[in-house]
């Protein structure tokens, strides 16, 4: 027997049933996708789909060459024809904005876009963190005021309500100011951290040289006292940045959205400015962040487009659905409405016709394949989770009737004329 080929570690199959190490099912995932489709339409966002492979330069320019994502986590390879460096996308914003610039979507109006799809990072797999993971992203492009900042926060809070997890999530916010303000803060931060360089761990020493703001994001408990006393970016904000942040907070207050100001919240990608935020939870162990985002007013220009102030956020679907499966509520119904079975010569063709007629009327019908006893077929109908069973045997064929059974017992088992099949099932379903 040939050796089985296993999936790549950290890249999961999505099956109709739960797996030992991956509890999410395809039906649960589909129910979430349906919820997201309704949610995004309610806020006027339109879907965009981009390739999973992009030129590596896109992420170097947008995310930042010195970031952990670009430096250590991307899957990068050369195209065999022209040696062009390509990468599997590690996040969705850069690809979305590349498409917007390439196709001139901001030519005459702002855009509200959303995406959903797989992303890839070469990380150590653990619960809620995988090498292939999926994101839902929201991008509001061409909007300058703090009102859109507050709107997308409210939008995300609305989704948490729909998923039944609002009480388990905490909103943290911060302002990173503009480029000049961050530069002034960076200089002060480097001067401060350099005094403690001998106490920094190796990762923080590296970040001190490449992206000192990320030192403040360390999870090392031995460095918390040093980081807590570090210069705060909020103290370097100018009047315009302060006003934007103050108006943003006032809008959150007006919407009744509670938040915590976290001056050490910086996000892991270089393109952020002004408003940044994260939704966190204490229910997933170390993987606390479920959703994060912020403003990236200079990114579209950085990618070759005309300047356009913008904001967005992304959520990791696997991590989010782990939270929903444990604490939330998501209506999942993968079972068919009807299980159609047959017994005897020519009954298989007739039940196929009945099943197709029911499907045209909106019923989900699973048709039995093969030839087994009615007892065996009824067992499969029960295992399928179908609410109703449709039986066509020799007596029904001869009399022009069908037998219907309510698997929940409410209507029992009845024989009805074939022409009344759809009407009867509709009555039972709506009762």
Curated annotation (Swiss-Prot):
Task: Give the top-level enzyme category.
Answer: ligase
Q: Does the keyword Protein biosynthesis apply?
A: yes
One annotated GO molecular function: histidine-tRNA ligase activity
Q: Which domain of life is it from?
A: Bacteria
Q: Which GO terms describe its biological process?
A: histidyl-tRNA aminoacylation
> A Pfam family this protein belongs to?
HGTP_anticodon
GO cellular component terms? cytoplasm
| PROSITE patterns hit by this protein | AA_TRNA_LIGASE_II (PS50862)
Q: Which UniProt keywords apply?
A: Aminoacyl-tRNA synthetase, ATP-binding, Cytoplasm, Ligase, Nucleotide-binding, Protein biosynthesis
> What does the record give as EC number?
6.1.1.21
Instruction: Write down the SUPFAM superfamilies for this protein, in alphabetical order.
Output: Class II aaRS ABD-related, Class II aaRS and biotin synthetases
Q: Which reaction does it catalyse?
A: tRNA(His) + L-histidine + ATP = L-histidyl-tRNA(His) + AMP + diphosphate + H(+)
Which InterPro entries does UniProt cross-reference here? aa-tRNA-synth_II (IPR006195), aa-tRNA-synth_II/BPL/LPL (IPR045864), Anticodon-bd (IPR004154), Anticodon-bd_dom_sf (IPR036621), His-tRNA-ligase (IPR015807), HisRS-like_core (IPR041715), HisRS/HisZ (IPR004516), HisRS_anticodon (IPR033656)
Cellular compartments annotated: Cytoplasm
HAMAP family from the UniProt entry: His_tRNA_synth (MF_00127)
Q: Which NCBIfam families match?
A: hisS
State the family named in the UniProt similarity comment for this chain: Belongs to the class-II aminoacyl-tRNA synthetase family.
The annotated subunit structure for this chain is: Homodimer.
User: What name has this protein been given in UniProt?
Assistant: Histidine--tRNA ligase
Q: Give the organism, scientific name.
A: Neisseria meningitidis serogroup C / serotype 2a (strain ATCC 700532 / DSM 15464 / FAM18)
Lineage, broadest ranks = Bacteria, Pseudomonadati, Pseudomonadota, Betaproteobacteria, Neisseriales
């Amino acid at each position: 027997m040939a050796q089985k080929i296993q999936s790549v570690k950290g890249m999961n199959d999505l099956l109709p049933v739960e797996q030992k190490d991956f509890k999410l099912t395809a039906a649960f995932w589909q129910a979430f996708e349906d919820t997201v489709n309704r949610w995004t339409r309610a806020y006027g966002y339109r879907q965009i789909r981009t390739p999973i492979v992009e030129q590596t330069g896109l992420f170097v320019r947008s995310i930042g060459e010195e970031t952990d994502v670009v430096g250590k986590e991307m899957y990068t390879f050369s195209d065999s024809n022209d040696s062009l460096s390509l990468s599997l996308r590690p996040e969705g914003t850069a690809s979305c904005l590349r498409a917007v610039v390439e196709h001139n979507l901001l030519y005459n109006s702002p855009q509200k876009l959303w995406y959903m799809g797989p992303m890839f990072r070469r990380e150590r797999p653990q619960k809620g963190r995988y090498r292939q993971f999926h994101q839902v992203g929201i991008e509001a492009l061409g909007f300058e005021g703090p009102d859109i900042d507050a709107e997308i926060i409210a939008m995300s809070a609305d989704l948490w309500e729909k998923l039944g997890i609002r009480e388990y999530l905490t909103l943290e916010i911060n302002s990173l100011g503009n480029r000049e303000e961050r530069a002034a803060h960076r200089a002060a931060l480097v001067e401060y951290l350099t005094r403690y360089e001998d106490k920094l761990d190796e990762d923080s020493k590296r970040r001190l040289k490449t992206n000192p703001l990320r030192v403040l994001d360390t999870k090392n408990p031995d460095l918390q006292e040093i980081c807590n006393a570090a210069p705060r970016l909020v103290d370097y904000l100018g009047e315009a940045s302060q006003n934007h942040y103050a108006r943003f907070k006032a809008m959150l207050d007006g919407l009744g959205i509670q938040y915590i100001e976290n001056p050490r919240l910086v996000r892991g990608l270089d393109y952020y400015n002004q408003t940044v935020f994260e939704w966190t939870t204490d229910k997933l162990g170390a993987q606390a962040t479920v959703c994060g985002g912020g403003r990236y007013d200079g990114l579209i220009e950085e990618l070759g487009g005309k300047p356009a102030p913008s904001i967005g956020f992304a959520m990791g679907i696997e991590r989010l659905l782990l939270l929903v499966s444990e604490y939330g509520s998501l209506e999942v119904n993968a079972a068919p409405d009807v299980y159609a079975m047959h017994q005897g010569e020519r009954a298989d063709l007739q039940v196929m016709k009945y099943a197709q007629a029911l499907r045209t009327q909106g019923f989900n019908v699973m048709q039995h394949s093969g030839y087994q006893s009615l007892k065996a077929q009824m067992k499969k109908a029960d295992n399928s989770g179908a609410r109703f069973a449709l039986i066509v045997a020799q007596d029904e064929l001869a009399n022009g009737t069908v037998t219907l059974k309510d698997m929940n017992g409410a209507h029992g088992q009845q024989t009805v004329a074939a022409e009344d099949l759809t009407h009867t099932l509709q009555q039972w379903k709506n009762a």
